[in-house]
Amino acid sequence: MGYRKAILLLSMGTTLLFLATPSPAQVDLGDYTVSGAIEAGGMPSHRSGNTSKLEEYRDLPETVVVPQLELFIDSKKKDFYLEFDSLKTGRDDQSYRLRTGRYGLVDVEFVWDQIPHLFNVDNARTPFNRDDGRYTLSSKPAGTTGANVRDWVNANAQPVDLKLYNGLARFNVRYTPTPGWTFSGSYGSQNTTGKRAFGVYIGPSPGSFNISELAEPIDYQTHNIELGGEYAGQGWSLGLKYNASLFHNNVSTLTWDNPLNTTGLGAACVDSAAYNPAAGTGPCRGRLDLYPSNQAHTFILNGAASLPFKTNFIGAFSYGWRLQNDPFLPFTINSAVIQPTISRRSLDGDVRPTMINATLVNNFFRDVGLKASYRYYDFDNRSKRVLLPDGFIVNDQGVTNGTELLSFPYSYAKQNIGLDASYNVARWLTAKLGYGWERMHREYARELLNSNEHSFGPTFDIKPTAWTLFRLSYRRFLRDAHDYDAGRNAAVEIGETPEDVRLSRLEELRKFDQAARQRDRFSFFTQISPLENLTLHGGFDFTNDRYPRTVIGVQKDIDYAPSLGFIYAPLEWLSIFGDYNWERFDWRMQAIARNTGPGGCPDLELRTAENCPAATWRSRGNDEIHTVKLGTEMQVVKNLLNLHFQYGFSFGSSEVRSSGNSAASGDTGLVPATDYPTIVNRWHEFIARLEYILHKNVSLKLGYYFNSYSSKDAGVDLMRLWMGDVETPAAGPNFSNSIGRSIFLGDRGKGSYQAHIGFLGVRLKF
């Protein structure tokens, strides 16, 4: 019915256009000229499957649409202008832009954008009733077995849409009173609302538990303010700018009823300190804090100057404050649990980032280019330390964990130096040599306090002819990691000694961001135009990361991306283009089981890959994406009929192969490592577009769009409201285990679909 109405309105509009006298390209109104364009039409379509992926970030209606609207008013004296344009007017992904001002003096702009984000509107369901951040149940399972939970959730769950709406408004002003002075200001506001999947947990860890997957309420408001001024003199400039970002979370706390406490509903429910899912006791509800409201302020001073000996300087200095002081929630909402002690009621979060950038470029010597750069960034965390002398409550049940903790405000500082020299060896060859140094300093609680990384390598630009270009570059990176010590985390776990902390984290474990690393990076690009109407291009990027001193953790990471493409215009009215890209990522890591038991390696002190090969497992991952694009542009009849065809295809896959952790380790309850099911997705797109120019100001547009998507992901495709028979089929008929007593949204993510969409429209210029 929707597309029939669209076709009827389009036919009426087309008839009126034929009957009307075409307008000139612009309209004179006194001292002003007015020009613009409007496009309107309909989008009949046929869709099948799960369309959440199709409309993930866009709105594709089956009604009349206005894809584009443009208006421009210009003064004949060239002292005033006004521009207005919009895209997809009235849709969920619409945008508007209004700009006006006086040439050379003032420019004012207002922009409005809407961006939808669709997670799932097809199969997510929940038994919870929501009131802002409060999730309540109007009923509970008849018993505490997994079968009771299954029957209850299937009977009481209601559909819920998982999607977000982003509304962004921005107002910009630029004022130039003199050729030297420029002042600017802007204000932006972003509102994000909606719901997305969010998992919560009640029960000890480790131990029995129950999960409830909720539709998390999202209601964020962010304000961004920017003010600045700049003066440009003869050969120099200086500017000062202020930025502010104010974030407010309108729903900062999440509270939910516990389906496994069967003592009653609402106020009739009785809290218990002991969590016993079989008996239906424990906390009546759970509670957690969401993202806190916060603010950031930054001052930026920047400048540039032309110096003697053909030298140019560019520099910037910034200093800021990031502040957050949201009150802490009590440790638990469970009234049967005694609240532990805490030293503060809020964090008083205070981070002072400092940044210095300085660059010198010199071209004094003929055919020689020199460049030196320095960057310093200091993340100075002045937040207060918080003491938990008795530890904390685990998931609203039981007693404190008894581990004395003292928070540590992590800080770091990073310095970078870059030196580059280039030389025009010949008319067709330019060679460049670069060196870089990076020093990272971390606060005491991190495993590695200081690391240095050196990089060096050449770049060559080769242009043997006017129609041929080759660019090759290679860079070698070497990062050290001396004095890696996991025991430094005792600064947080103050009830433990450094030796205790080292044992609990395994001596051989290295975190990849702090581990010694060797990196090789190679890049190649070429562009060849053997004919005036033919251009070929290609490239290859390769990065190889190795972690030579890592036994437990990431050991290797390789990625490479070859690409090919062409543009060919065999005829004046015909052009053909094509591209192929392949990206591949390979990684390897090694891990070791930490559980102890009879046989094998019962002590963490002796638990190494060499001593316990049977308890060690290896994982090898491979991710790759193939993308193909082919198309053509045809001007069949000049200034009358244009055609466009384009086809796109992509194929992506992700594999994880695992081995090891065999029963020979002797550990009780051992689960051998197994391969993860391969994730695969395919995407096809075909576009056909025709433009028939009825008059220089009137054109008819016809289009067809085909889009197909398929995906196979075992971790998502199997999701249902209740997963007990999927996780442990042998636990039936009662399924009285943790997953059997858990509930989910049943959100299967972005399922497969096919869509055929037409477009019938008219574009009118005036």
What name fits each language-model region?
Residues 27-30, 34, 44-766:
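Gram-negative and organellar
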